[in-house]
Each structure stands twice: as C-alpha cells, then as structure tokens.
Amino acid sequence: MNIQSSIDKNSIKAVNNLNALLCISKVLNEDIVNITDIHLMKKGMTNRSFYFQCRGKKYIMRIPGEGTDKLINRKEEASVYRAIAGKDLSDRVLYINPVNGYKITEFYRDARMCDAHNKMDVKCCLERLREFHEMKLQVEHEFDLFAQIEFYESLWQGTPSGYSDYAETKSRVFSLQQYINEYKEEYCLTHIDAVPDNFLILSDGSVKLIDWEYAAMQDPHVDIAMFAIYSLYDKEQVDNLIDIYFDGYCPKEIRIKIYCYIAVCGLLWSNWCEYKEKLGVKFCEYAYRQYQYAKDFFDIVQRNLIN
C-alpha cells in the first residue's frame, strides 16, 4: 500500500510530519486512514501540538519545537511521568517517547485552562498544586535554577545579551542564592512550569496538571513564582497569590524567598527567550517582562530585607 496516497492531504499539511502520523497509527493500533480531523492547536512556547480524532475519540499529540532537544531531557521527563503515575495528577498519557519527545494524550472535552485573573480558578488550581507538593514525590534529577541560567546563556554561543545591563542584573540575581539556601525548607518533585496554561479545569471541577517536561527536584515554592511571572502579575497580585497558596499565612522570610525566586526565574526565562529568539522564535513583550522581573524583584527583596 502507498501510505502517502492513503492519507488525507490536509492531514499531512496540518501535521507536517508523516512520522507523527505513523506513530499515532502504531500506538492506537489503527489504520492511518482512521486518523482524522487533524488541526493545530495554538503553538506553545516550547512545543507544537495538534488535535486529532480516531473513531470518534479525541486526542492530542505533542511534537517538540525548535531547539527543544537542547532544553529538555526526554528521559528525565519520562521518569517524571512514572513518578506521578496513579496519583491522578496529570492528563492521561497514552504514549511518550524518551528519545524524540513525541507524546500522545487523551483530550478532555469541556476542559479549560486556568484563568490567572479569575480568583476561583486560581484558588482551586493553587490548592491542587499544594496537594501535589505535599505528596513529596521523588525523582533522581534536579532543576538547578542558577545552573540553568548559565546553561541557557551558554546556548547563545558567545553572542551578547540584548540587554546592556545584563552582567549587572545577573550578578545581583545570583547574590540572592545565599538567602534562598537559608530558607529552603522542602525539596521534592516540583513542576517548574506550573503556569496557568498547564492547569486544566475539568467539567466536574477537578484539576489536572499537564506538561511535566521541566519537572524535577526543587523547592516547591518555585512553582508559585513560575505561576506569577507567566501571568505577568504585579507585586500586589503576587502577594495575593502567595496568600492563596498559604491559606492566608506565609512567614515573612518565605515570602521574601519567593520574591527571590521571581527575580531568579525571571532571569532564567529571559535567557531562555533570548536563546529561542536567536532561533527565530520571538516572544517580545513576554521576554522583556521576564527580564524586568529579575530587576524589579531584586529591588523588592532588598527593600524588604531593610524593613
């Protein structure tokens, strides 16, 4: 049989990857002609994903994006999915390839992403995040924030940052490491990419955390910082987020530590964005705001330490 001729040309155009279609066929044990209604989802910051149907059931397939092979260790990602298996935390993963990063999951009808500006959405998602943290799951790899900043910078291959004060900003951010280490109380599996888009609220009100590719051992409070900076929260919104997570009581030292994480994670994702932009992927306002978090929250930390 000529496989190429048996596939809907629109499907090939939507996926732009025949290997992905062959993978779906093998995983679902279905003839490739039964893979229908393929259409791209909104392109993510790290990956490209698409919906498809097979015999009336919907699925999602992820294909890693530009330069992702340098950013994500797919074997470590697979180990995370093994660690969370049976915990009812994630969407249902039917297939994950630890080499090329292909992933197939079931599609949840009537599910929606968390709205970072809806208080009830944020509350239920932060409660679920805290429940995950309290499980204190373990894996064998870690996500070292400061080492990753250096790593992303190394991917620039000697080209300078687009920010003229980068060296000064980096030095200031790295000076926060001592305070962080002093108040780092927990160390467990942390999502790392716990942004609103990665919380699915199902029709029954339950919450699933998806896209665990950055997950690793870390201080779980990093996830609070990540949620805040992706949402582009101002300081008042950050404080409200912290209060929701801690149910109204967060010790001052821990709050300041989270401010530190916001500065550190801002620089981390700014460097990540600079790498992706060198590959032709533009983030514009988001990238600029991440760099500003590094600067602004360093200043906020200093003011809080003085008072």
Spans of features found by a protein language model:
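Active-site acidic catalytic loop and adjacent metal/ATP-binding pocket
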Residues: 42-56, 60-61, 177-224
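Activation segment
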Residues: 66, 110, 207, 215-217, ...
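An alpha-helical support segment within catalytic cores of ATP-dependent transferases
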Residues: 13-32, 36-37, 137-192, 197, ...
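Active-site activation/catalytic loop segments of kinase-like enzymes and analogous catalytic loops
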Residues: 221-250, 263-281, 293
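Regulatory N- and C-terminal appendages and interdomain linkers associated
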Residues: 1-33, 295-307
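ATP/Mg2+ or Mg2+-diphosphate-binding catalytic cores
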Residues: 9, 271-307
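Extended, well-ordered alpha-helical scaffold segments
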Residues: 123-124, 165-176, 241, 283-297
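ATP-binding pocket architecture of kinase catalytic cores
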Residues: 39-145, 161-167
